[in-house]
Design a protein with these regions (language model features):
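Sec-dependent bacterial lipoprotein signal peptides
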Residues: 1-19
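A structural "domain/chain start" motif
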Residues: 19-101, 114, 213-217
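Sequence contexts marking disulfide-bonded cysteines in secreted/extracellular proteins
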Residues: 20, 61, 138-140, 147-149, ...
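A mature extracytoplasmic/lumenal domain signature
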Residues: 46, 78, 125-128, 164, ...
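Solvent-exposed, acidic/flexible segments
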Residues: 50-58, 98-102, 153, 193-204
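Short, solvent-exposed beta-strand-terminating loops
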Residues: 72, 77-78, 131-133, 171-183
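Surface-exposed short loop/turn segments
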Residues: 94-169
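Short secondary-structure boundary motifs at beta->alpha junctions and helix caps
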Residues: 144-212
Length: 217
């Protein structure tokens, strides 16, 4: 293969890989309202119930929602957990909306939530996982230099759901979801160049957009 052909093939690889597909959905169960002086809080599912939603994903959604709107406040997850310790730690927090009365039955907790005007708790579940992978890279060094050759790829799926709970009504008012699939690849002709689908960051963007849109509807 000529040098020009190799370059053409490499450009083609850059164009066709590292892509992702995003699907978002929204479900509204009952009427809801929120004002500018009220807050929402995001919590992840517990590691006791399976795979815990990644910490960096939770931080991404918290930050993204804060930047996208000024219609309501968002209390950072870790700050909320510290203020209400130990009631909303991963091992003790309610895992379903049916568990809310167990926590809100504590008058001290309920009064503090009311004083801080925390109206909605958003329970985020999901994870990013690799579905399939293949290929191989080989790197070597010699007297004339070194390099890597080969081709590797993997498919990732990032699927997350946010269940929105009204703390005053102790009920779920809706759900939003983001599902992102993508293929990442690393072609190597002397120098390996990762081309990443970044499904988790795209899922963060999609889910935060859906949450903001939910409260804007």
């Amino acid at each position: 293969m000529t040098s020009l052909s190799k370059k053409a093939l490499f450009v083609l690889v850059l164009l066709v890989v590292g892509c992702s597909t995003t699907r978002v959905d929204e479900e509204i169960n009952s009427a809801f309202t929120i004002s500018s002086d009220e807050s929402i809080v995001l919590l992840s599912n517990s590691y006791h119930t399976g795979n815990q939603t990644e910490l960096d994903f939770m931080e991404c959604v918290n930050s993204s929602i804060s930047k996208k709107q000024n219609a309501f406040d968002i209390l950072p997850t870790r700050q909320f957990q510290n203020l209400f310790y130990p009631w909303f730690e991963p091992s003790t927090a309610p895992q379903t909306v049916e568990d809310l009365p167990k926590v809100l039955g504590n008058d001290l907790i309920k009064e503090k939530l009311s004083q801080m005007k925390i109206k909605y708790l958003i329970k985020i579940t999901g994870q990013t996982k690799t579905n399939a992978s293949s290929g191989a890279l080989s790197c070597a060094a010699g007297p004339g230099g070194g390099g890597c050759f080969g081709f590797a790829w993997w498919d990732d799926t990032s699927e997350y759901t946010a269940s929105i709970w009204d703390l005053s009504q102790e009920t779920a008012v809706g759900n939003v979801t983001a599902n992102v699939t993508g293929t990442s690849m690393i072609p190597a002709i002397v120098i390996p160049i990762p081309i990443l689908a970044r499904t988790q960051s795209n899922a963060c963007e999609g889910l935060s957009n859906q949450i903001v849109s939910f409260f804007s509807s």
